[in-house]
A protein has these predicted regions:
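Beta-strand secondary-structure signal
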Residues: 106, 150, 255-259, 279, ...
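Beta-rich globular "head" domains
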Residues: 73-79, 101-108, 243-266
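Exposed beta-sheet edge/beta-hairpin loop segments within beta-rich domains
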Residues: 93-101, 199-200, 245-250, 269-272, ...
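Short beta-strand and beta-hairpin "edge-sheet" elements
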Residues: 281-326
């Protein structure tokens, strides 16, 4: 099939999106944005800020020694896409059950950035539950809040809170901004957590995940040719041993590349973008939807001939393989 209808486009600009909440895809692990792709051009690298504790925030028995009180150290946290500082909160009250049964209270940072205690439903026995919103279990906390600790009591008699009553296991009792670990997928405009986020907020939803990002805008590269996607190659090496051979395989990711005729080789737009990480979109037939997406750092090698227009040989150094798209 002839490639005379082929077209190569490059990322010539972006559509920016300010810090806003991402949407849970439904599995509590993949969060979608409003963009199809995430740019990584200069000044446009995605910034992802899941709600959660960053530094400080230790919850300890009140230094005053007063019954039913805890102290919360000053802290920083991601809150609605902003890094917030929260002042120390001393002598914060914990409400015990009215009888000698188990009760769990969550120490939280509200959406307004202040400390608040959210009490769970009292048990009917001295047994605690790990199920949210159950009798004797931790509460579902408000959407937009951050849980930093739980305080567990099993008696109704006023007494100092002890260290043994305070629970701060990350992922169970404490929501951190850096847990679970996440990766950003520029080729799908999504954020992926390595484990599903706990559904501990009202309505059975996860903590909120915020991000700012930019979606690439594409422009056709005129007079381009010889596009090569970034693809993985495989090789085999062998070692001779007694009675036979042991083989091992290895893989490597090759550079993408293309060539183009230039106007003057100096003011051409593609030359102005050299050394940036850009998206490139290749259509084998510009009248059809299938295309190849490649994101990588643009390298250029210019040739200035005596009688011809300047030419450029471009490389695309990618972190991942090019992606084949049907539409």
């Amino acid at each position: 099939m002839s490639n005379e209808n082929s077209k190569l486009e490059y990322e010539s600009g972006v559509l920016p999106y300010s810090m806003s909440a991402l949407t849970d895809s439904g599995d509590r692990a993949v969060f979608n944005s409003n963009a199809v792709l995430f740019s990584e051009s200069v000044g446009n690298v995605p910034v992802v800020r899941p709600n959660g504790l960053l530094t400080g925030g230790a919850v300890v028995p009140a230094t005053s020694g007063t019954n039913n009180l805890v102290d919360i150290a000053a802290l920083t946290c991601n809150l609605a896409g902003v890094i917030r500082s929260v002042s120390v909160a001393t002598d914060t009250a914990i409400t015990r059950a009215t009888t000698n049964v188990a009760s769990i209270s969550s120490i939280t940072i509200t959406a307004a950035g202040v400390v608040a205690v959210v009490k769970g439903t009292d048990s009917t026995t001295s047994a605690f539950s790990e199920t949210r919103a159950s009798a004797g279990g931790p509460p579902l906390i408000p959407v937009g809040s951050i849980e930093i600790a739980q305080v567990r009591t099993a008696t109704n008699a006023a007494a100092p809170i002890t260290a043994a009553d305070i629970f701060t296991t990350i992922g169970t009792h404490t929501e951190r901004a850096d847990f679970p670990v996440f990766t950003v997928d520029n080729l799908t405009g999504t954020v992926h957590f390595d484990t599903p986020l706990p559904a501990i907020h009202a309505g059975g939803v996860t903590k909120q995940v915020f991000a700012s990002y930019a979606e690439p805008i594409f422009t056709e590269q005129p007079f381009s040719n010889d596009f090569v996607p970034a693809e993985t190659s495989h090789s085999v090496s062998s070692t001779q041993v007694y009675g036979g051979t042991i083989g091992t395989s290895s893989s490597s990711l090759g550079q993408g590349s293309f060539t183009a005729e230039l106007k003057d080789g100096i003011t051409d737009n593609i030359i102005k973008r050299k050394n940036e990480i850009l998206f490139f979109r290749y259509y084998q037939d510009k009248y059809k939807a299938p295309h190849i997406l490649t994101q990588g750092r643009l390298g250029v090698g210019r040739t200035f001939g005596a009688s011809n227009n300047p030419k450029v040989s471009c490389t695309i150094s990618s972190a991942v393989e090019s992606s084949d798209r049907a539409s």
